């Protein structure tokens, strides 16, 4: 919602216990072409294909520094679409945000960034989290790390992912991102739009994952 950390203090004043901003990438990017958000009223759902549109990490961190937070602020980070090194992008964002964030969310689950969900592979996820943990030690950072996962994980894979998360000093798991699953049960004319599905249609799936 608050992609560029523009209204987090206003949200705190409304009574929210915490606010998470982002997803933020190292460099500014536009995201996918518009239209990229579709409301499926009859299905009580949304489909979005925003594509990590944001102003870039340095612009956002400067905004946060000039507008002191009055509540618990999480910062959601991810790689740029055209990056040559996604691991490096996560580390760059960690370096930029660890001093201003109350926690940092590692987003590995957006269906709108090609192959991002490959980080649900046990080996790739372990490599990423080991590098995050090593960088935190280099920075002498105590900022808690959360990982945001997909609802489209099968039962065999979730056990392996859970083991990796527990082994790598991850403090929280966010369940879940939007779903890339079939839309056959939906009725709205926009149901086949490309993007991540959220809302009532994935309630059972995400709750089961919890």
Language-model-detected regions and their locations in the chain:
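Hydrophobic faces of well-ordered beta-strands that scaffold small-molecule active sites
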Residues: 17-21, 48, 73-77, 104-107, ...
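Active-site beta-loop-alpha junctions enriched in small/polar residues
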Residues: 1-2, 24, 78-82, 109-111, ...
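Alpha-helix-loop-beta-strand connector modules within alpha/beta enzyme cores
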Residues: 44-72, 121-147, 192-210
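Glycine-rich, proline-tolerant flexible connector loops at the mouths of alpha/beta enzymes
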Residues: 23-34, 46-47, 102-122, 182-184
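Glycine/Thr-rich beta-alpha phosphate-binding loop at enzyme active sites
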Residues: 111-124, 164-210
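N-terminal capping/small domains of soluble enzymes
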Residues: 1-73
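Active-site glycine- and acidic-residue-rich loops that bind
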Residues: 79-91, 118, 124, 146-166
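Non-catalytic positions within long, well-ordered alpha-helices that form the structural scaffold/packing
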Residues: 11-12, 97-98, 166
């Amino acid at each position: 919602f608050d992609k560029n950390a523009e209204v987090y203090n206003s949200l705190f004043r409304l009574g929210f216990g915490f606010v998470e901003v982002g997803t933020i990438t190292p460099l500014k990017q536009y995201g996918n072409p518009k239209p990229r958000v579709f409301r499926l009223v009859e299905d009580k759902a949304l489909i979005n294909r925003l594509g990590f549109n944001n102003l870039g990490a340095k612009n956002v961190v400067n905004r946060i520094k000039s507008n002191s937070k009055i509540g618990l602020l999480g910062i959601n980070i991810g790689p740029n679409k055209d990056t040559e090194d996604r691991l490096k992008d996560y580390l760059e964002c960690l370096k930029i945000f660890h001093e201003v964030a109350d926690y940092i969310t590692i987003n590995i689950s957006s269906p709108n960034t090609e192959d991002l969900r490959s980080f649900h592979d046990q080996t790739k996820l372990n490599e990423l989290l080991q590098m995050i943990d090593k960088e935190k030690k280099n920075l002498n950072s105590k900022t808690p790390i959360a990982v945001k996962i997909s609802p489209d994980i099968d039962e065999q894979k979730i056990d392996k992912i859970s083991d990796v998360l527990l082994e790598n000093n991850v403090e929280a798991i966010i369940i879940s991102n939007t779903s890339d699953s079939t839309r056959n049960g939906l009725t709205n004319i926009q149901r086949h739009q490309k993007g991540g599905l959220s809302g009532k249609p994935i309630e059972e799936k995400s709750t089961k994952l919890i």
